UniProtKB/Swiss-Prot annotation:
Family stated for the protein in its record: Belongs to the UPF0178 family.
Pfam families registered for this protein in UniProt: DUF188 (PF02639)
PANTHER family: UPF0178 PROTEIN YAII
Record organism: Acidithiobacillus ferrooxidans (strain ATCC 23270 / DSM 14882 / CIP 104768 / NCIMB 8455)
Top-level taxon of the source organism: Bacteria
Name used for this protein in its record: UPF0178 protein AFE_3267
Length: 147
């Protein structure tokens, strides 16, 4: 299993959890971003910097993943594309996206986008809590045990 991270919006605390898991299990971890990142030095961790632009990092990830890989992302359309390639998708809050739930998540995302486009303020996600960090670590462990 290769772990890929949609790194531009991924919280640092989640990246730290991923660095430790990558080193502990000797799994390749690739962070894809449109800017240079400071990452933990490890033989298993690398970064890929892509040009700025809409979905450029997402497309880079989808182009390289293979069945069974894991992608960390809060981006619902990217998660849907990952699932189509028989890979795993996990949010930084520990939500595991699945073929059964992704279509509903896409509908909700599209509805919220329409509301924002019509001028309704929908607010953003809450700050990442300790419970979110623990949920992520637990979900990651469950996925990696299966690998």
């Amino acid at each position: 299993m290769h772990i890929w991270v949609d790194a531009d919006a991924c919280p640092n605390v989640i990246k730290d959890i991923l660095y430790r898991a990558s080193d502990r299990l000797k799994l390749p971890l690739t962070l894809v971003a449109n800017q240079a990142l400071r990452v933990h030095r490890s033989a298993y961790i690398r970064t890929v910097v892509v040009p700025r632009g809409f979905d450029v990092a997402d497309e880079e990830i989808v182009r390289h993943i293979v069945a069974g890989d894991l992608v960390i992302t809060a981006d619902i359309p990217l998660a849907a594309a990952v699932l189509e390639k028989n890979s795993h998708a996990l949010s930084p809050r520990g939500e595991r996206y699945s073929p059964e739930t992704i279509h509903e998540r896409l509908r909700i995302r599209d509805m919220m986008e329409q509301l924002r486009d019509s001028g309704v303020r929908t607010g953003g996600p809450a700050a990442l809590s300790q419970a979110d960090r623990q949920a992520f670590a637990n979900a990651l462990d469950q996925l990696l045990v299966r690998a």
